[in-house]
Regions:
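Cysteine-nucleophile amide-bond enzymes
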Residues: 48-459
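Bacterial N-terminal signal peptides that target proteins for export
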Residues: 11, 16-32
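Bacterial N-terminal signal peptides
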Residues: 28-42
């Protein structure tokens, strides 16, 4: 039996320190399903006067309506006069203290950009930035684009539609809510506070999801765990089929034989992370034997004879075993697979024992972190293997295990820490390597002490 870690596909060069926003593509169908699933447990958005709909209850980005109002003569000037405007930074008393105004021309349109500061600059996609688009040909207003998070794919598009004003909302580059009617003339939007737009649409738009959240204590807990792991990564050794057994020795997973200096493969590394929660409770790391146990109830009859030869379900059984073993130590009972798996099969495109497209992983983690903050996820990456022999159906091979820590930082920005085989990588790195594959997720409850066991021979 061989563990399926595929180290030759591991993108060590993709190591990153921080993932600020979601850039992995999320299909519209999957995103719609995620929204529907989350709506079952999140309160629906209410009217403008309710606790949810009121601007005071939401993390609305810094406002720049004061500067837009001050420059209303420019906004409504002729397109030729607008194009002649020079860039400048203006101060205001409310919202963003400083706002950069500039004009850009492209493809027959002129853009009036009111950028809020972020870091040392004024990026176009900073939260709260308004971009007004006008036609150069006739000066007509085409649309207003408003970024509502520090992410290029999370914004509002507001446009005139006859005598109506209509708004589309986008989240991570995919449609979130479309053709929301606003009860005001389009001209009023041009100088209106974002908080007013939120109020006007509170009954139709789930702003609690579209705007960034306030971090919860569970988010800070995950950030601390990620920091602990990051500090230890450089001391770990890499070794095919390597893991730590129940007595703290470095061994080969397949045989249990001692492994000299030893090291971790992807499966062994994930075990070591979960042992950081298990060992303080049990007094020792997990035993390897039970984690390798195959799920007889999951096997397909035609594939049983290939289990010993190819062990196609290893990553799935291993990650479920880690989740079950920890949960049993925490609660005293062994949970069923359905309790540790991330399924939501009634609303999401979950495939049994396969999971979700890797392409959709970061969007899925965003909603999981909003719905159930503070959880760690183990992923088993899988894809169809080559046919065992002519005329034999292709098997599904679970070949790689990853550790995922999704949380919202102190600024409310979404972060996903990805760790795999002793390295920190990223969601974009996973998508580059496994973009056409699937990942099955199990959840880990990180309550209690976190102290990964010492590794013999660590550097």
């Amino acid at each position: 039996m061989q563990t399926r870690c595929l180290p030759d596909r591991h993108d060590a060069g993709a190591t990153v320190r921080r993932v600020r926003a979601i850039h992995a593509p999320v299909t519209g169908a999957v995103l719609a399903g995620l929204v529907a699933a989350l709506a079952l447990i999140a309160p629906p958005c209410a009217s403008a006067g309710s606790a949810i709909g009121a601007p005071a209850s939401l993390a609305i980005p810094a406002e720049n309506w004061e500067v837009r109002t001050r420059l209303s003569d420019v906004i409504f000037a002729t397109s030729r006069e607008v194009a002649a405007q020079k860039p400048r930074v203006l101060t205001q008393e409310t919202g963003a203290a400083r706002v950069r105004f500039q004009v850009q021309q492209q493809d027959g349109a002129v853009y009036l950009v009111f950028s809020n500061p972020r870091g040392a600059g004024y990026p176009l996609d900073s939260a709260g930035t308004f971009i007004i688009k006008r036609s150069l040909a006739d000066g007509s207003f085409v649309q207003v684009k408003v970024f509502v998070q520090d992410d290029p794919g999370t914004y509002l598009r507001i446009f005139p539609d006859g005598d109506r004003t209509v708004m589309d909302a986008w989240l991570f580059g995919e449609p979130f809510q479309s053709r929301v009617a606003l009860p005001v003339a389009f001209d009023r939007v041009l100088t209106a506070p974002l908080s007013s737009i939120v109020e006007w649409s509170a009954a139709a738009v789930d702003w609690s999801l579209l705007l960034k959240p306030s971090p919860a204590p569970e988010d800070r807990r995950l950030q601390e765990i990620a920091g602990t792991l990051q500090a230890r990564l450089r001391t770990l050794r890499d070794m095919d089929d390597g893991a730590m057994d129940g007595s703290g020795r470095m061994v080969y997973i397949a045989t249990g034989a001692p492994a000299a200096r030893g090291g971790f493969n992807c499966s062994g590394f994930a075990k070591w992370v979960v042992d950081g929660l298990y060992a303080p409770l049990a007094g020792h790391p997990m035993e390897i034997g039970p984690l390798k146990s195959r799920n007889a109830g999951r096997d397909n009859p035609w594939s049983t004879r290939f289990e010993e030869e190819m062990d196609p379900w290893f990553g799935l059984d291993w990650t479920r075993g880690l989740a079950r073993t920890l949960a049993q130590e925490q609660a005293g009972t062994v949970p069923a697979d359905a309790r540790v798996d991330v399924r939501d099969a009634d609303h999401l495109a979950y495939i049994r024992d396969v999971g979700y497209p890797v392409q959709s992983l970061q969007g899925l983690l965003y909603f999981l972190a909003r719905r159930d903050p503070g959880k760690i996820y183990l992923g088993s990456v899988n894809a169809p293997s080559s046919a065992v022999s002519e005329g034999t159906p292709t098997l599904r091979q679970h070949h790689h295990v990853i550790v995922l820590l999704p949380y919202f930082d102190s600024d409310g920005a979404f972060q996903v820490v990805v760790m795999e085989r002793n390295l920190r990588t990223s969601i974009p790195s996973l998508v580059r390597r496994y973009g056409s594959e699937y990942v099955h997720l199990v959840r880990i409850d990180p309550r209690g002490e976190f102290d990964p066991p010492p590794v013999p021979g660590a550097r």
